[in-house]
A protein has these predicted regions:
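Small cysteine-rich, disulfide-bonded extracellular modules of the LU/uPAR three-finger superfamily
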Residues: 1-76, 80-127
Length: 127
């Protein structure tokens, strides 16, 4: 059994890298703009991760994404970013982690996809 302090230490370490969230298609390609989930030098996020449950990182609220016509949405990924020497924020390539949905949806016309906060989480378990 892992003690709560160790479990939450792992959770908090991973959470510090979760700076944005993006939707992906079934190939893992980004299909939406990145929505910031932590503060950057010039931005305070609307959407954040909740860490009040031991060992869990969960979206604190639903996150809406604008989706173009013909785009498939099949999952979400957490991203990190960096500030360059000039103080400009850029998103890192690649993802930290995320989840694929049981089924994907393809938008026949432009619309909105809402990633629901309650079922969107990462459960940390150290074995």
């Amino acid at each position: 059994m892992i003690d709560t302090a160790t479990l939450n230490g792992a959770r908090d370490s991973i959470n510090s890298d979760f700076q944005g969230i993006v939707l992906v298609d079934s190939l893992g390609t980004e299909v939406s703009d990145v929505i910031p989930t932590s503060s950057t030098p010039d931005f305070t996020p609307t959407y954040v991760w909740d860490t009040t449950t031991d060992g869990r990182i969960q979206l604190a609220q639903d996150v809406p994404f604008s989706i173009a016509a013909g785009v498939e949405v099949a999952g979400w990924r957490a991203k990190s970013g960096t500030t360059d020497i000039g103080g400009n924020w850029t998103w890192d390539t690649g993802f930290i982690l995320g989840e694929d949905f049981n089924t994907s949806v393809t938008f026949s016309s432009a619309g909105e996809f809402t990633l629901e906060g309650i079922p969107t989480y990462i459960q940390i378990s150290l074995v």
